[in-house]
UniProtKB/Swiss-Prot annotation:
The chain crosses the membrane at residues 92-112, 147-167. It comes from Trichormus variabilis (strain ATCC 29413 / PCC 7937). It is found in: Cellular thylakoid membrane. It is a multi-pass membrane protein. This is Photosystem I reaction center subunit XI. Its main location: membrane. Belongs to the PsaL family. Disulfide bonds: none annotated. GO terms for cellular component: photosystem I reaction center; plasma membrane-derived thylakoid membrane. Residues 1-24 are annotated as: Disordered. NCBIfam families: PRK00704.1-4.
């Protein structure tokens, strides 16, 4: 097996000898690498359409979208996998747990905002990072909207889970 790999080094036409990882922009001084994953058009499209990098959004709108997603998906593990999962009020415990974690995340974001974070650097995946996170005010707007969105997302998940039988009866 090792013989075949060694022999392929002598054949420039062998596909195993093609370089697939390059320095970003072909400049090794950048300290970033272009790989088949992070330089693919699909990954670039996906990353650049996330709320953190989507162009034209205010920091408040970014925080609201990110918070809603986090609040919504944090509810489930607390409600269905937590220590009160078999209790009658498991959904309420899940709601309170998700809200508590969103509050802790918001405090962490506020602390980070007040620590003078460095400016976002351009990378292979995100060539034009948004300027929404260049100031304390932008980060604090993001954090306050994250709190509102996170609590809202957890409440929506709570109502959907608590009223599942009613929703199922309405739909069919």
């Amino acid at each position: 097996m090792a013989q075949a790999v060694d022999a392929s080094k002598n054949l420039p036409s062998d596909p195993r000898n093609r370089e697939v990882v390059f320095p970003a922009g072909r400049d090794p001084q950048w300290g970033n690498l272009e790989t088949p994953v992070n330089a693919s058009p699909l990954v670039k499209w996906f990353i650049n359409n996330l709320p953190a990098y989507r162009p034209g959004l205010t920091p408040f709108r970014r925080g609201l979208e990110v918070g809603m997603a986090h609040g919504y998906f944090l509810f489930g593990p607390f409600a269905k996998l937590g220590p009160l999962r078999d209790a009658a009020n498991a959904n309420l415990a899940g709601l309170l747990g998700a809200i508590g974690l969103v509050v802790l995340f918001t405090l962490s974001l506020s602390l980070y905002a007040n620590s003078n974070p460095p400016k976002a650097l351009a990378s292979v995946t995100v060539p034009n990072p948004p300027d929404a996170f260049q100031s304390k005010e932008g980060w604090n707007n993001f954090a306050s909207a994250f709190l509102i969105g996170g609590i809202g997302g957890a409440v929506v998940a709570y109502f959907l889970t608590s009223n599942f039988a009613l929703i199922q009866g309405l739909v069919g």
